[in-house]
Design a protein with these regions (language model features):
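Active-site region of glycoside hydrolase catalytic domains
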Residues: 2-60, 103-105, 114-479
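A common structural microfeature
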Residues: 10-12, 73, 90
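Active-site mouth loops of central-metabolism enzymes
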Residues: 61-75, 152-155
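Internal amphipathic alpha-helical repeat/solenoid segments
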Residues: 69-81, 102, 113
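Catalytic domains of carbohydrate-active enzymes, especially glycoside hydrolases
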Residues: 75-96, 304-310
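A short acidic, glycine/proline-enriched capping/turn motif at secondary-structure boundaries
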Residues: 89, 98-100, 138-140
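Glycine-rich, proline-tolerant flexible connector loops at the mouths of alpha/beta enzymes
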Residues: 95-109
Length: 479
């Protein structure tokens, strides 16, 4: 039976990055300032990304890793050649909004920014790599935040629509796979990064978050509509930070807590995939005194323009309890979870659960019956070169192999429809959560440290050759 388990022909293997974590060149060729540029490494980072502390420009005494990233803006040809050497079928990347519209509300785009991405996409096609493009990945021009309050304002719909129309028109024939917002549910956990939100003292933060979420959901529907009109070959997906919530015990209140936590996550895809707000959300808003302003036109857009596929990031499952204050916690993707005593953890406390990926795939498939795409998965670890300068990252290979097996089982034994898999940070980049460089995910090592020092030289890790073989055999090399 095992030898019959395989990945479908045309399965899209690849890797993923984000503009704000790798491009650098924050002020070159007309690019404007963005929210992620001014998020520093250090103890204030969490307060800033959660909207509790305002930082709208660079301040003395801080180091801002996104300003330079890994200098992919100047080195993308070298990097894409390495992706081509691995045999990537797809490369997920994001557009820096402020490269295209530096302030965000201009009527005409910045040609230098448009040309940069056109050249990059053509470089991908040179190696037979299909671009998978995230329109906004924790990225908002700073002017839209200081002038309008970010996604709390309906003004953002107009600006985002102009961005999308520009991208879909310019890159018609070069890009056919689009994601509207990265990890859209992170607006609840990292609202400054996810939506450019900062809160005033005494403000109803949940009200602001859900109003901004409504604007992003409508914007996503507008993008889907435009993409299909401009090029019928376009496929548009949503993107969620996923991971099943297990009940801490079989106590009914723990099971209920897990269901509630899952609903908070799936709320966004419920709207994007089904086209309407779920009843449980309306009831919860009423209980909390939240009034989300929306028009009949908004609701019609949501209904008429659902996504073609569902993409998500998966790093770990989570644990929920009816008494969370009494339970031990562990780190996770931006926000913490309760600790699962049955799982091992990474150096950053993220718990390792490949079966959880299979469970998550089945949950999403059963809930929506839409094709899926895993667009982030990987192990953040400290990689130390040996005396020969090589990275022997067998721990990363073990992690990824276990998750590849889980995908294969979900496809062959459970019948889910999965289009592709892009590992996160296929080349080392700046961590979104911590701002660190030493938390590495890549198959390609980048010589740069947490203080911005290093040659930026690229080198292949052991996992580089492993993943190359995985792709060449369409997953058959993973036993």
């Amino acid at each position: 039976m095992t030898d019959k388990l395989q990945f479908p022909d045309g399965f899209l293997w690849g890797g993923a990055t984000a503009a704000n974590q790798c491009e650098g060149a924050y002020n070159e060729d007309g690019r404007g300032l963005a929210n992620v540029d001014v998020v520093p490494i250090g103890p204030d980072r969490h307060a800033i990304i959660t909207g509790q502390k305002k930082m709208f420009d660079f301040e003395e005494g801080y180091f801002y890793p996104a300003k330079d990233g890994i200098d992919m803006y100047h080195r993308y040809k070298e990097d894409i050649a390495l992706f081509g050497e691995m045999g990537f079928k797809t490369y997920r990347l994001s557009i820096a909004w402020s490269r295209i519209f530096p302030k965000g509300d201009e009527l005409e785009p910045n040609e230098a920014g448009l040309q940069f991405y056109e050249d990059l996409f053509k470089e991908c096609h040179k190696y037979g790599i299909e671009p998978l493009v995230t329109i906004t990945h924790f990225d908002c021009p700073m002017h839209l935040i200081t002038e309008y309050g970010g996604w709390r304002s309906r003004k953002m719909l107009e600006c985002y629509e102009r961005l999308c129309r520009t991208l879909f028109t310019r890159y018609k024939g070069l890009v056919n796979y689009w994601l509207t917002f990265n990890e859209i549910n992170m607006i609840l956990h990292a609202p400054f990064m996810g939506a450019g939100l900062c809160f005033e003292e005494g403000e109803n933060e949940e009200q602001v978050k859900y109003q901004a979420a409504h604007h992003e959901l409508v914007a996503s529907a507008i993008a889907t509509k435009l993409a299909h009109e401009i090029d019928p070959n376009n496929k548009v997906g949503c993107m969620l930070a996923a991971g099943q919530n297990y009940p801490h015990t079989c106590a009914p209140r723990d099971v209920w807590a897990g269901l509630e936590e899952d609903r908070k996550n799936y709320f966004f895809i419920d709207v994007q995939a089904r086209g309407e707000y779920p009843n449980y959300a309306k009831k919860e808003w009423k209980r909390q005194g939240i009034t989300v302003e929306m028009t009949e036109q908004d609701l019609q857009l949501l209904k008429d323009h659902t996504v073609d596929f569902i993409s998500f990031s998966y790093y770990a499952s989570r644990v929920a309890s009816g008494d969370p204050a009494e339970r031990e916690k562990t780190a996770g993707n931006i926000f913490a979870s309760l600790k699962n005593p049955y799982l091992e953890s990474s150096e950053w406390g993220w718990q390792i659960d490949p079966l959880g990926l299979r469970i998550t795939l089945n949950t999403i498939w059963d809930r929506y019956q839409k094709p899926m795409f895993i667009v982030e998965n990987g192990l953040g670890a400290v990689d130390t070169p040996n005396e020969d300068g090589e990275i022997e990252d067998g721990y990363r290979i073990d992690y990824l192999a276990a998750h590849v097996k889980a995908m294969r089982e979900a496809i062959n034994e459970d019948g889910v429809v999965l289009w592709g898999y892009t590992t996160w940070g296929c080349i080392d980049l700046v961590s979104a959560g911590t701002g660190e460089m030493k938390k590495r995910y890549g198959f390609i090592y980048v010589d740069r440290d947490n203080e911005g020092k290093g040659s930026l030289e690229r080198s292949r890790k052991k996992s580089f050759y492993w993943y190359k073989e995985v792709i060449a055999t369409n997953g058959a090399s993973v036993n």
